[in-house]
Curated annotation (Swiss-Prot):
Belongs to the class-I aminoacyl-tRNA synthetase family. This is Arginine--tRNA ligase. Gene3D superfamilies: Arginyl tRNA synthetase N-terminal domain (3.30.1360.70), HUPs (3.40.50.620), Isoleucyl-tRNA Synthetase, Domain 1 (1.10.730.10). Its EC number is 6.1.1.19. The keyword Aminoacyl-tRNA synthetase applies. The gene is argS. Keywords: Aminoacyl-tRNA synthetase, ATP-binding, Cytoplasm, Ligase, Nucleotide-binding, Protein biosynthesis.
Amino acid sequence: MNIVEQMKERIKEEIKRAVVSAGFAAEEEVPEVILEVPREKAHGDYSTNMAMQLARIAKKPPRAIAEEIVQHMDKTKASIEKIDIAGPGFINFYMDNRYLTELIPTIIQAGASYGETNVGKGQKVQVEFVSANPTGDLHLGHARGAAVGDSLCNILEKAGFDVTREYYINDAGNQIYNLAKSVEARYFQALGIDKEMPEDGYYGEDIIEIGKKLAEEHGDKYVHMDEQERLAFFREYGLNYELEKIKKDLADFRVTFDVWYSETSLYTSGKIDETLALLRERGHIYEKDGATWFRSTTFGDDKDRVLIKKDGTYTYLLPDIAYHQDKLRRGFTKIINIWGADHHGYIPRMKAAIEALGYDPDVLEVEIIQLVNLYQNGERVKMSKRTGKAVTMRELMEEVGLDATRYFFAMRSSDTHLDFDMDLAVSQSNENPVYYVQYAHARVSSILRQGEELQLSYEGDLQLDYIQTEKEIELLKKLGEFPSAVSEAAIKRMPHRITGYVFELASALHSFYNAEKVLDPENIEKSRARLALMKAVQITLQNALALIGVSAPEKM
């Protein structure tokens, strides 16, 4: 807990003590003390609505309650300079902000670990994201899911959760049969043999490339092979080719996974049969019209769901239930799925299945990723200029850069549509948020280099009482918010809280830089203190940007 968190706790304790001392409630009956940062600076550093919370119990006007609470408070116990009462009874606290300078050596000493919290308490959390079918390129929806998922994992780890990152490989089912048939057709065509593409085939350039590669390396070796053997080979070849491509694209996007979980393994291990037997044993399965049904309405779904069709084939739901059963057996306290917008209706049946298996349905959390619209020159970009098809993740990365892509995708709440302005993403101006933030880091790094050239060091004993101007205090306050921003982003599953935070920190830095002279050869101790402040800003910017997968350049 850093000095800011400690101070907030002291204020809360002092409010609680004052409430008890004033006779409004016994210690165990005092409502939770809520401290908020007022929107207007004029309303102080912190504010509480405790008087309103107590009004019903005390049967007094909130303002009168607030006055009594203030009378019983000891300001010296929490570095409070002034307290006032506003509106119907809000209590506003104005801090003696000199205590904030203690943050500077704390941050420098913590380095890359600054911002770490323990709200997760080591809980085992699994985050499954991207999980695109291995039948073609990753597109914009996958890219946004990758950026949000990876950022969320980084944030959860920073907040003390034990995180497993998982990609579910959809390597069973009809789409993989169609992949094998598509590879077969392209292979025959590469040899000059007429072969029709399957009705639901994959027409991407990558499948044409696979066909050519096979023809070049193996000639007509597979033409005369038994068809089932040939398709089994093409299935594996095509699947591995596409998976390696996906892994490479994701690695280049700074996204890695701990587990690549194969859907096929659910069949070969008997886990699907085992899950079906368990649901049957619990009385949640019935037969109707030649099909096998899951009685999901028992658990709040709007209708029962087919698990096995009349022809004996499985619906998507059955292996998905088996997969979630396996997740739960691995001991995760939370399983977080990051799904595309088209999966919204799938959530109730999945939660129903989890409850039917005997688990708490709230163990499953689903974050929905809404659609992305690309804009260039003020117009919506629907197709790639190069391929005439949907824009891929790699194309976007190459067009606007990795950092801009990662930042923009994590900039808004994932459940809202995102309009991605490609012109803005590449512009070197303060209107471009990623440029603005990275420039703050480059600016701080430049100041630190200048300090080295002047042989000024921020190490050793510092006279931190030089740090006292309004802009310096604003910067310190923002630095002190980082751990709570991490905790909030983790608990609320909000990566965009960090993009918002890092932008605010950059803004505070630019504002300070424009108002103050950092290095003054005439005042060595003041310069050293300010250099230490700049080092603390540099560390915090680096740590925040790392959470959202964005680099922190030293020069721009």
